UniProtKB/Swiss-Prot annotation:
One of its GO terms (cellular component) is mitochondrial outer membrane. Keywords: Cytoplasm, Nucleus, Phosphoprotein. Signal peptide: none annotated. Pfam families: Iml2-TPR_39 (PF10300). This is Inclusion body clearance protein iml2.
Amino acid sequence: MFRVGSWLYGKKPAANASTQSLDSLVELRDPATLILNDDVDGAEAGLAEGTSTFHNLGRGVVAFIRATLGFEQDIMRQASERLNEAETSASVDQHRAQHNSHAPNTYHSPMYSPGTEFALCQAIAQLMSAIVGVLNESLTESIKAFYRLRKAYITLDAILKMEQKYMEESRSATLVESTTSGSVPSSQRHSSSNLQSSSSSISSAKVKEATADTLAAPSKDTDVNERLADLSLSGEAPVAEDPGQTPTPINTDILDHDPDSDIFQNQIDVFVHSGSNFCFGVLLLLISMVPPSFSKLLSIIGFHGDKERGLKMLWQASKFHNLIGGIAAFAILGYYNGFVRYCDIMPDSIPGKDGDVQGYPQKRLELLLAKMRERFPKSQLWLLEESRMSGANKNLDRALELLCGEERSPLKQVEALRVFERSLNAMYLHKYELCADSFLECVDLNSWSRSLYYYIAGSCHLSLYRDVKETDSAKAAKHAELAEKYFRMAPTVAGKKRFMARQLPFDVFVARKFAKWEARAKEWKVSLVDAVGIDPIEEMIFFWNGHSRMTDEQLQESLQKLAWSESNANTTWSREGPEEKAILKLLRAAVHRSLRKHTQAKEMLEDILGQDRTLFKGHLKDDWICPVAHFEMAANLWMERPTYIANHSGAKQDSDKESAGPADAKDALQYERERVRKCKEYLEKAAKWESYELDARIGLKVTAAMEAVQKWESTHPTV
């Protein structure tokens, strides 16, 4: 069988880095992608056959995917070890490639300096190691993660500069050729073309030499520290180290080139381009999403995200038919069907425009998902994404149906995700028994937040207890017993998992809630289930933003469930203080907002915000009420804008709005500007709020909302 190098060069190549890179990339292309088809054994077996840097990285990526899907400590340790091995191997191969760059038969990329593919392998390993480190329970590992992140950035920045320079030279060459061909004799045009080609080659060589210096030793502490102050993930180049050099923004024209473009004829260039766009895109996107308290820390050390550019780079990476393209597609679908659906204030969509990446480009997402389902037909991972997309577009019944089939994924982490998503969909649909059973199944499949799983299972049986309390005492007793059983189990497993050495937010929430109910039960001399306040399932639906996925009928069902608290069936309502009553109003306001009844929603929120905030502070109290009420008020104001269009197909449109504002265009703009101004005021208050329970979770919404407001202001400047 012919080797790839022989086919490319016409004769048997010498053993050099470039031909080895080509051979290794082709060898692992199919085995590596098997992980995205739920065939982990096939992926591991195929990757075990080689010892190259690319095979080492492939094994690390497989472990990384499993680690990020399941958050299990043993898998994360395995991923960390494999990625470290890949990073070390890549460093050795990079130096060898640079040393042997002038050997016969060596491939010389028109864009990248020798050894760039190995520098990218290091950056990928460093980035994935950083993510695993942040997910690790150790604070030390989390700190090390940021150091790896800095090193990866420097490498990726250098690679993108090569692409930028190549595109600039290509445009210059084209411009000179078109200019000379129109007014100069053919002999002179030929001479001019040669001169331009020679000049361009010399310039390109200088750029490659300069960037090769950066890539040669990206791990040196002195180099990292010197460049730290200049780090920026906003899509612009760092401050030039040479005073005479003027930094220019990274050119985006290369993102318009598809995989069949002439500049991607070599597999090494394909790997470098798709890989660097994926990695840098992930960096830009993740850092743009962090909560306000954490983003301040990142900005101090020079990290600033750019969501729009990050998404464009991920979309570009997803075009390529390799492992990186598949992972990029998974990241894109996860972002839009997960994060975007979790947030309530997002930038306005631009209908029919491919460049619209910050809204919810539904048609584009459907095409991407269809392509992935075709590439990986056996994978439950993409079926899971189809379910998420259905839920995001207010078709929860279809979303649940997709996850209730008999087929199971052989990959435990994917199966755990499937059951978890099924649990959430059942919760949104008020299918309590299915929800409880599914969350209990999660306990056996995943160890990430078992306290939350038990808590929600207990809450489901509490709802069933309340439903039959006055009509079937036997069933009521059974559900009360199960509810108390799972409630008592929840705090016993809380705190087992940590994120950056801190307890998981919902673990803290669950432990406090149980302690609060237990104290009330003793004080009121009632059972634990009768000491519970506002429906905890409705509270969970709110925290997981289930209302955005629900139809009007399903939202009305939530209102009916909330009405139980004030009904005669609730014998403890007269004992409730302002805290539980505020939670009831807040949850009702959230449902009314989703029903587009903003006047009623704001009235309820104003009543909460008019109270003394100290009423909601103290031991065992829900201190999240006021900051969340501020965010909810901001969301109502944002949705009241005349130009607001929800980012999903099941949304009500302008004709269904409670109020679309003034009809006159000038008055409408002024009305919208006023809505945005007030929205921003409430968001700023929420962002500056003191530490409170679940602040990191709510902070994600606040960060996304502030970015959306800033984008609106940039497109609607005041005269």
